[in-house]
Amino acid sequence: MSSSLYRVLRNAWEVGPRSYWKQLNSIGDTKSGRLVGTDIYGNKFYETDHQDEIHLRTRYVEYKEKDYDMSQVEPGWHFWLGYGVDTAPCNTPKEKLPIRAYPYKFQPNYTGTPGAFVTYNTLKPKISAWEPVTKQRS
C-alpha cells in the first residue's frame, strides 16, 4: 500500500476537509501540491514535491466535472501529466508551442452521450426482435 498514516493526515491538513473528501471520492487517495495551471475546460493541474510520493505519481489533475473522462484534458496537459515535458503548457513560451499538423479544435470524447457519432444504416436489419405469439387456450 502506498499510503502511510502520516502522509494521509499531512495531505488532509494541507488541502482542507472539502478537497480531502472530494479527492477520496474521485481518485481514492489524498494528494497535496502546488497549482501549476488550469486548462480551458476548468480542470486544475497540480504537482507535488513530497519525497514520500510514488515515483511518477507526483502530477495529478482535479477535474471540473463530477463525471469526468480523460479525453476532457487538452493534449498539451495530457503530455505534461505523462512526464513527456517538464514545463507545463501554461509556462511554455509561444515560440516553443508545437504546431499541429491538423489544426482542428480539440473535442472531448462523446461516447455514451447524446452527442456520440452514430452511423446511418440503409441496409435491412439482419436480426429482428422476437415477438411471442400466444395461442388461445380451449
Curated annotation (Swiss-Prot):
<comment type="function">
    <text>Accessory subunit of the mitochondrial membrane respiratory chain NADH dehydrogenase (Complex I), that is believed not to be involved in catalysis. Complex I functions in the transfer of electrons from NADH to the respiratory chain. The immediate electron acceptor for the enzyme is believed to be ubiquinone.</text>
</comment>
<keyword id="KW-0496">Mitochondrion</keyword>
<dbReference type="GO" id="GO:0045271">
    <property type="term" value="C:respiratory chain complex I"/>
</dbReference>
<keyword id="KW-0249">Electron transport</keyword>
<keyword id="KW-0999">Mitochondrion inner membrane</keyword>
<keyword id="KW-0472">Membrane</keyword>
<comment type="subunit">
    <text>Complex I is composed of 42 different subunits.</text>
</comment>
<dbReference type="Pfam" id="PF05071">
    <property type="entry name" value="NDUFA12"/>
</dbReference>
<dbReference type="GO" id="GO:0005743">
    <property type="term" value="C:mitochondrial inner membrane"/>
</dbReference>
<comment type="similarity">
    <text>Belongs to the complex I NDUFA12 subunit family.</text>
</comment>
<protein>
    <recommendedName>
        <fullName>NADH dehydrogenase [ubiquinone] 1 alpha subcomplex subunit N7BM</fullName>
    </recommendedName>
</protein>
<keyword id="KW-0813">Transport</keyword>
<keyword id="KW-0679">Respiratory chain</keyword>
<dbReference type="InterPro" id="IPR007763">
    <property type="entry name" value="NDUFA12"/>
</dbReference>
